[in-house]
Regions:
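C-terminal flanking helix
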Residues: 16-19, 23, 206-210
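N-terminal core-binding DNA-recognition domain of tyrosine site-specific recombinases/integrases
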Residues: 1-20, 63-64, 141-145, 163-165
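Catalytic-site neighborhood detector that most strongly recognizes the C-terminal catalytic loop/helix
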Residues: 47, 106-110, 191-216
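Basic, Lys/Arg- and aromatic-enriched nucleic-acid-binding interface segment
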Residues: 5-11, 24-82, 86, 131
Length: 221
């Protein structure tokens, strides 16, 4: 039986963990994993195109499936991670003369994420079911396995190129922002990344980006 590199790494990582635990309990006197580091496996990130995201947004679904879809779309327009959706409260929505902003510290890094909210995103946020009271979280967010199960079905319905899952939301957000010409530094701030280098893994060159830049070059010539 053959495994993909990432799957093999996960199994080896679990084996290393249990070997080290056995050593701490005195069940093993030595461990081949002592001091060993598993090589990182670079994963290719996938994003929805603007057209695919629009198709998903208007797909006729109901109940928990509609909730899963709307949470995905909200994240694709704000860059929020799953855990940040669970901790979102009304206090994270600020309004000034320039419009509405979502500002909140990322749960994973503590870095401040800051995204301007469009009218459409605010409308989507308004129609999502809310929790009462909302001291630790405002939105009703199902567990990620439930969301992924519904996303997979919807992706199959839309004949998407890749299996639709939660991890595609932030990559979709970053890719669409970069295609609009937003700088890598600005996208990094929106995502709440501590370093721009972290954002660069989202900045895969897309066909739309190449055509856009070729068009600019040809006009300049």
């Amino acid at each position: 039986m053959a495994f993909r590199a990432q799957t093999a790494r996960l199994y080896l990582s679990a084996l290393r963990h249990f070997c080290r635990m056995a050593m701490r309990k005195g069940l093993l006197t030595s461990c081949v994993w002592q001091g060993a580091e598993l090589p990182r496996v670079e994963k290719r990130h996938f994003a929805l195109t603007r057209n695919e995201l629009d198709q998903l947004s208007v797909l006729d679904v109901h109940g928990t499936r509609a909730l899963a879809r709307n949470l995905f779309v909200l994240s694709a327009h704000t860059g929020l991670a799953y855990i940040d959706l669970k901790h979102l409260t009304p206090q994270h929505i600020e309004r000034d003369s320039s419009g509405a902003w979502l500002t909140m510290p990322r749960h994973k890094t503590g870095q401040q994420a800051m995204v301007r909210l469009t009218t459409a995103t605010l409308a989507l946020l308004d129609k999502l079911p809310k929790l009462q009271p909302c001291a630790t979280g405002w939105l009703q967010v199902p567990d990620n396995r439930t969301i992924n199960r519904h996303l997979h079905v919807m992706g199959h319905t839309l004949h998407l190129r890749q299996r639709l899952h939660l991890h595609m939301r932030r990559h979709t957000f970053a890719t669409l922002m970069l295609q609009r010409g937003v700088s890598l530094e600005a996208v990094s701030t929106m995502l709440g990344h501590a370093r721009v280098a972290t954002t660069q893994r989202y900045a895969e060159v897309t066909r739309q980006k190449i055509l856009h830049e070729l068009g600019q070059t040809q006009r300049a010539d």
